[in-house]
Amino acid sequence: FDDYGHMRF
C-alpha cells in the first residue's frame, strides 16, 4: 500500500 512519509509498497 501507499505509506506516505516512508516508502511506497
Swiss-Prot record:
Offer one example of a GO biological process linked to this entry. Answer: neuropeptide signaling pathway
Say where the protein is mainly found. secreted
Q: Which residues carry this modification: Sulfotyrosine?
A: 4
**Where are residues bearing Phenylalanine amide located in the sequence?**
9
Give compartment(s). Secreted
PROSITE patterns the UniProt entry points to: GASTRIN
| Protein's UniProt keywords contain Secreted | yes
InterPro entries noted in UniProt: Gastrin/cholecystokinin_CS (IPR013152), Sulfakinin (IPR013259)
- Keywords carried by this UniProt record: Amidation, Neuropeptide, Secreted, Sulfation
The answer to whether UniProt assigns keyword Translocase to this entry is no
UniProt GO cellular component terms: extracellular region
Any Pfam family the entry gives: Sulfakinin
Where does the signal sequence lie? none
Q: What job does this protein perform? A: Myotropic peptide.
User: Could you say which protein family the record assigns here?
Assistant: Belongs to the gastrin/cholecystokinin family.
| The name this protein goes by in its record | Neosulfakinin-1
